[in-house]
């Protein structure tokens, strides 16, 4: 009996679909979180720009932090894509593991971007009236950013499980 690659129960032909889905979801959801954070905090920055233009540069911190979220998704997507090859056998375990990596970093960055956007918008508006709030706002932004970092760390740990 001739064995074909698709006859392997542990590496069916549809297994790479889950890996590609994980790669795509890591980028899509992370960039969506970055876009939400940038848009929401950008509204606040545009609002204070007409009253106090000198505060705009200090108020860009939420936008920069939101952009970093997309980098988290990019790192995980590149690692997942590096494990995909048309010539090597790809198991269903690796497919599900890569899907969970993408979902983990994607949803973590999505929620982080939403939090950064809300804190950035309200924080920038209140900072215009009370400059002493700056340190507190930055601390809250850091805690919001760390949510996305946690998702990336878990995705990296999961990704190493497939390489063993």
UniProtKB/Swiss-Prot annotation:
Record's bilayer topology term: Multi-pass membrane protein
Classification of source organism: Eukaryota, Fungi, Dikarya, Ascomycota, Saccharomycotina
Spans through the membrane: 17-37, 60-80, 99-119, 137-157
Organism, scientific name: Candida glabrata (strain ATCC 2001 / BCRC 20586 / JCM 3761 / NBRC 0622 / NRRL Y-65 / CBS 138)
Compartmental location: Vacuole membrane
SUPFAM superfamilies: F1F0 ATP synthase subunit C
Similarity field: Belongs to the V-ATPase proteolipid subunit family.
Alphabetized UniProt keyword annotations: Hydrogen ion transport, Ion transport, Membrane, Transmembrane, Transmembrane helix, Transport, Vacuole
Described purpose of this protein according to its UniProt entry: Proton-conducting pore forming subunit of the V0 complex of vacuolar(H+)-ATPase (V-ATPase), a multisubunit enzyme composed of a peripheral complex (V1) that hydrolyzes ATP and a membrane integral complex (V0) that translocates protons. V-ATPase is responsible for acidifying and maintaining the pH of intracellular compartments.
Subunit description: V-ATPase is a heteromultimeric enzyme composed of a peripheral catalytic V1 complex (components A to H) attached to an integral membrane V0 proton pore complex (components: a, c, c', c'', d, e, f and VOA1). The decameric c-ring forms the proton-conducting pore, and is composed of eight proteolipid subunits c, one subunit c' and one subunit c''.
Name of the protein in its database record: V-type proton ATPase subunit c'
Molecular function terms from GO: proton-transporting ATPase activity, rotational mechanism
GO cellular component, one term: vacuolar proton-transporting V-type ATPase, V0 domain
């Amino acid at each position: 009996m001739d064995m074909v690659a698709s006859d392997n129960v542990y590496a069916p032909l549809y297994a790479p679909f889950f890996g590609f889905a994980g790669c795509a979801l890591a980028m899509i959801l992370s960039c969506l979180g970055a876009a939400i954070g940038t848009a929401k905090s950008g509204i606040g920055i545009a609002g204070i720009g007409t009253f106090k233009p000198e505060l705009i540069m200090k108020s860009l911190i939420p936008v920069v932090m939101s952009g970093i979220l997309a980098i988290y998704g990019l790192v995980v997507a590149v690692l997942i894509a590096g494990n995909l090859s048309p010539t090597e056998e790809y198991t269903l375990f690796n497919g599900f593991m890569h899907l969970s990596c993408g979902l983990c970093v994607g949803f973590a960055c999505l929620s982080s971007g939403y939090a950064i956007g809300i804190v950035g918008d309200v924080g920038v508006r209140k900072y215009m009236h009370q400059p002493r709030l700056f340190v507190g706002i930055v601390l809250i932004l850091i805690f919001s950013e760390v949510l996305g970092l946690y998702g990336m760390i878990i995705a990296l740990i999961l990704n190493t499980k497939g390489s063993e």
